[in-house]
Amino acid sequence: MTKLPSDASAIKRVEANTSPEQVIELLKQDGVVVLKDFLDQATVQSFREEIKPAIDDFEGGPNFNPDGVKVDIGRGTKHVANLTAISKTYRHDILNNKWMHSILEPLFRPHFGDYWMNRGSVLHIEPGEPAQNLHRDDILYRVTKLRQPGDPDLMINILIAVTEFRDDNGATRFVPGSHVWDDTRGVPTPDQASSAALRPGDALLFVGSLWHGAGSNQSDAFRQGLLLCIHPCHFTPMESHLHVPRTIVESMTPQAQKMIGWRSGITQHDVPIWLAGDHKMEETMGLRSQEVQ
C-alpha cells in the first residue's frame, strides 16, 4: 500500500469509531476532516464494479457551462451521476451509512430539519488531467452571500475514495479554515492548499464554503472518488430522482427514499414540505419500502 505523504497531516484524520461530536468539532474548526474507513473494502469493490460500465461509456468534460460559476473541468474529468439507478450498493449501503447519518443529523436537524441529496456523482480523473481551480461549492446558492459568521452551513460534502488519492494522481486540495473567510480575502493561492491523501474507503467530510479543488493527475492511472453533496430539504437538488423506476425506489429504505426526494420532509419547526397536495408524498403514492437488509 502506498505510504501517505507527510503533508496529509495538515488535514486531521479520525478513526471509524470516532463520535459524531468529535467529528463535528473538527469540521467546524477546519472545514474538513478525513473519516478513515468510512466504507469497508467489500462495499468499495462492489460499488466500483457496478459503476464501471457507466464510467466507460461517459464522455469527459464539463456537463454544463454555467455563467458566473468558474470551476475548471477538463476533457479528462468525468462527473457521472444517476447512481441510484446504476448502483445497488449506492442505494442500499451508501445512502444508509449509519456513521454518515449520525453526523448529518446534528448538523442539519436543529437548523433546517430534514436533509436530502443535492447530487451524488463519481468524480473520475484520467492521467494527464491538470489541476482544478480552487473554488467553493456553495456558490450554487445566492443566499450564501447573506450568511453571517457562525451561521450553519448550507451544504455538507462527503468525498469517498474509490481508488487511492495521492499527490501524483489528483488528490483533492483543501485550504483548511477558509470556510470562515469573507469575500475580502479573495481566492487562495495553490500554495495555501494541502492535499488529502486517502486509501480506498476513506472519506473527506467538508463544508460547501471551504476552498478546494482536485489536483493534477500526473500518474499513469485514473483517480476515482464518490461525491455525496447534501443540503437541507428546503433547497431544490441539482439532481432529480423522479425518473428512477418505482420498483427500484421501493426496494430502498425510507431513509434512502427521503435522501432522493421520494418522501416528504419536515423542517426544524415540524412543518411538512414536499407534499402531495395536503398529504405526505409517500402516503398519497402508496409508496412501499424495505428495511436495511
UniProtKB/Swiss-Prot annotation:
Biotech use, per record: Compounds in the chrodrimanin family such as chrodrimanin A or verruculide A exhibit strong inhibitory activities against protein tyrosine phosphatase 1B (PTP1B) and therefore, they could potentially be developed into drugs for the treatment of type 2 diabetes or obesity. Furthermore, chrodrimanin B, the end product of the pathway involving chrodrimanin A or verruculide A, does not exhibit the PTP1B inhibitory activity, while it functions as a potent blocker of insect GABA-gated chloride channels.
Biological pathway: Secondary metabolite biosynthesis; terpenoid biosynthesis
Entry cofactors: Fe cation
Pfam families on file: PhyH
SUPFAM superfamilies membership: Clavaminate synthase-like (SSF51197)
EC number: 1.14.11.-
GO biological process: terpenoid biosynthetic process
Superkingdom of the organism of origin: Eukaryota
Record has Metal-binding as a keyword: yes
Positions contributing to Fe cation binding: H135, D137, H212
Function: Dioxygenase; part of the gene cluster that mediates the biosynthesis of chrodrimanin B, a meroterpenoid that acts as a potent blocker of insect GABA-gated chloride channels. The first step of the pathway is the biosynthesis of 6-hydroxymellein by the polyketide synthase cdmE. The prenyltransferase cdmH acts as a 6-hydroxymellein 5-farnesyltransferase and produces the hydrophobic metabolite verruculide C. The FAD-dependent monooxygenase cdmI further converts verruculide C into verruculide B.
Similarity comment text for this entry: Belongs to the PhyH family.
Subunit structure of this chain's protein: Homodimer.
Name assigned to this protein: Dioxygenase cdmA
Source organism (scientific name): Talaromyces verruculosus (Penicillium verruculosum)
Highest classification ranks of the organism: Eukaryota, Fungi, Dikarya, Ascomycota, Pezizomycotina
Gene name of the record: cdmA
